[in-house]
Amino acid sequence: MIAAQLLAYYFTELKDDQVKKIDKYLYAMRLSDETLIDIMTRFRKEMKNGLSRDFNPTATVKMLPTFVRSIPDGSEKGDFIALDLGGSSFRILRVQVNHEKNQNVHMESEVYDTPENIVHGSGSQLFDHVAECLGDFMEKRKIKDKKLPVGFTFSFPCQQSKIDEAILITWTKRFKASGVEGADVVKLLNKAIKKRGDYDANIVAVVNDTVGTMMTCGYDDQHCEVGLIIGTGTNACYMEELRHIDLVEGDEGRMCINTEWGAFGDDGSLEDIRTEFDREIDRGSLNPGKQLFEKMVSGMYLGELVRLILVKMAKEGLLFEGRITPELLTRGKFNTSDVSAIEKNKEGLHNAKEILTRLGVEPSDDDCVSVQHVCTIVSFRSANLVAATLGAILNRLRDNKGTPRLRTTVGVDGSLYKTHPQYSRRFHKTLRRLVPDSDVRFLLSESGSGKGAAMVTAVAYRLAEQHRQIEETLAHFHLTKDMLLEVKKRMRAEMELGLRKQTHNNAVVKMLPSFVRRTPDGTENGDFLALDLGGTNFRVLLVKIRSGKKRTVEMHNKIYAIPIEIMQGTGEELFDHIVSCISDFLDYMGIKGPRMPLGFTFSFPCQQTSLDAGILITWTKGFKATDCVGHDVVTLLRDAIKRREEFDLDVVAVVNDTVGTMMTCAYEEPTCEVGLIVGTGSNACYMEEMKNVEMVEGDQGQMCINMEWGAFGDNGCLDDIRTHYDRLVDEYSLNAGKQRYEKMISGMYLGEIVRNILIDFTKKGFLFRGQISETLKTRGIFETKFLSQIESDRLALLQVRAILQQLGLNSTCDDSILVKTVCGVVSRRAAQLCGAGMAAVVDKIRENRGLDRLNVTVGVDGTLYKLHPHFSRIMHQTVKELSPKCNVSFLLSEDGSGKGAALITAVGVRLRTEASS
């Protein structure tokens, strides 16, 4: 017993002694964490260079766009062929994907040889061989008559400009077929298939094996966004933000980047850590000076690295008593599989003895211990280097997401990772030290990258079909110039019907006379009250207008809420609430005494018989108060003031908010004679010649016409451009069948149109993984402000996702892109339709005056126009295109329509004074 313990102690001492000697001898291969962190920094810089348009041509890490934009979402289905070429053998698979109830994938595959004479021959020989194997595979399965989609895993660096094209940059590993570098491998394969003529194949996607691995694992774990191969060769890919990829148009979404990290160091950036053995390996390789990182870490070279170290140590008398055999000197006699066998925990030393004996040396126990430690140092260095480069990718992903802690999955494949007994454990341990703020799950790719090629093909098929259906749906929102000219023509016709006495009663665009006959001339003076009612908030203002050399307008205002129960209660309750708010304001300003002139901005369709009388035609924008329609709103206001018995007011004018906006802007800019509101609702007004206003006596001068254009289309004249979604929104609105034009362009409804489209797309499985949340079912959830935020060019998709999450919608990156697209299509149509209406107005003014060219200013207000990032630009462009003879300027009303009501009151008081004198 004691003898055995002594022997064990002696052996341990001996082993420790040998280990120390080897550590000293191979000191340059032992990398500290400090060195590894430095390598991470270098690789991060190389990644940045590869993604940059300016630096990519000279970058060693090519960061190739793969045009794979999406990982599987579980809804893929179909029958696919996958080809897998890139390693020691060539595999063909038939992959049947079914997503009914349980996702399942049925695969059958066959492995074909790729002999040396083929991989080192001509390109046509290589692809003829691939086509022949594919023919054999299809023949055996009786599927030659089916034109199945094919995914092609081609594990070499390729330049892609689309998913079904791959131009080979350079051969790696043992491949050297001539005439292929610089050519599109899809064309070469198609040519070989066509030459045979006995079957047809549709090559949908070419992917790198690393991308294939990511996609294979992505089918099982949708958090998988990195692919890693550590086998014969080594490489990694990951999902990069498109905005960082200079080589590809667009900045929405993500794309898988094939890093081709095997070439890291080809520019000399790793010279300080390369050893004499690395240089010797490189000199004897098929591609000297290339793939230097791969030659330090991949399975193709580790065995050879160990052999070179053993030869040198033997020559120096440090091993095998200085004996060198012909076998030990022969390249390829010591493989990476031997390294794996020697590093096994229990039988490693026994395996070392067997392998070394096979090489003709007669190893001592010392020799076996030394060789085992050489293998450990070489494979450990590989694991450390791969951990450093993967760590750089994980840090980039974390930064892209703007998250303090990254949670992600890495799909892994490759013989070295899978079969080496210690590799994965060491690799994971080093990675955890290098990136402590990342939680990484490693998912082993059980079925290789062939299944991944099929998944890429399945995803491409799914996305193509989805894209077709999405485009088909959204095409109904695209308006051509001819369609917009037709809308302009119809608006013009409806305007004429509204102006004529004979047709006015049946006209949908009411063209209501406002009895505002002039815009301000600058001589207005005095203190005026203004009320502004038109939405959920109600404003009371005190406006002090001063004329003279320096004209000034000083305003004080207070905002009051109108509860929904009052909006939809009785008319008496509504006007009592308004008067109560006025009373509070007069107290607040300390002016509850003199009888002040008041202008009332009332933003609903009214038939006016004078400046201070307006009969409500219909409620809009969610108001439903009873006993108001058909009544004079000024009388209702005066009655409520009398009921309160606290104060009296001189109600001089009732005006629409659009007219108020025009007057506000006309005070600043005399050429302003059109008003436009595009906010919660939409409307326009303009100065019409009195001779055309048949509803009012007199032919001299002008009068502002409140168009009430929101009702355009209520007679069915826009039915050909209204979509299924417009009809849905109308059907469930408070005023079904009314204000149809407004429901296509105003802020109150755009979000609802978007919501209905999103529900439809979710039902079809295009969004939110097919799950319709309670939030999405909630009417009114998509406020216009969210549309404006989502469409902002400044917002990255992460922020779009954050907005959707605020709304209770958990979206992927792809979901966010589609939501943004839908918002864009809906708001663009709104801006174009609004522009077509405005074009009809300005052309009418021009023709009224018999002008070749008209210069006119439009005063504009409304949240949609003000806040939406693209609405105003698209609307202006549309007006310009549809009315080329009008030079139209747009002036934003900064002070709302309340100031306009005060100005109309001031003009009214001035005209009244002039008339009495």
Swiss-Prot record:
Keyword terms of this UniProt record: Acetylation, Allosteric enzyme, ATP-binding, Charcot-Marie-Tooth disease, Cytoplasm, Disease variant, Glycolysis, Hereditary hemolytic anemia, Immunity, Inflammatory response, Innate immunity, Intellectual disability, Kinase, Membrane, Mitochondrion, Mitochondrion outer membrane, Neurodegeneration, Neuropathy, Nucleotide-binding, Phosphoprotein, Repeat, Retinitis pigmentosa, Transferase
Domain Hexokinase, residue spans: 16-458, 464-906
Region (Hexokinase large subdomain 1): 208-447
Residue numbers carrying N-acetylmethionine: M1
Region (Mitochondrial-binding peptide (MBP)): 1-10
Protein name: Hexokinase-1
Regulation of activity: Hexokinase is an allosteric enzyme inhibited by its product D-glucose 6-phosphate. Hexokinase activity is inhibited by N-acetyl-D-glucosamine.
Subcellular location: Mitochondrion outer membrane; Cytoplasm, Cytosol
Organism: Homo sapiens (Human)
Residues annotated to bind D-glucose 6-phosphate 1: D84, L85, G86, G87, S88, S89, F90, R91, D209, T232, D413, G414, S415, S449
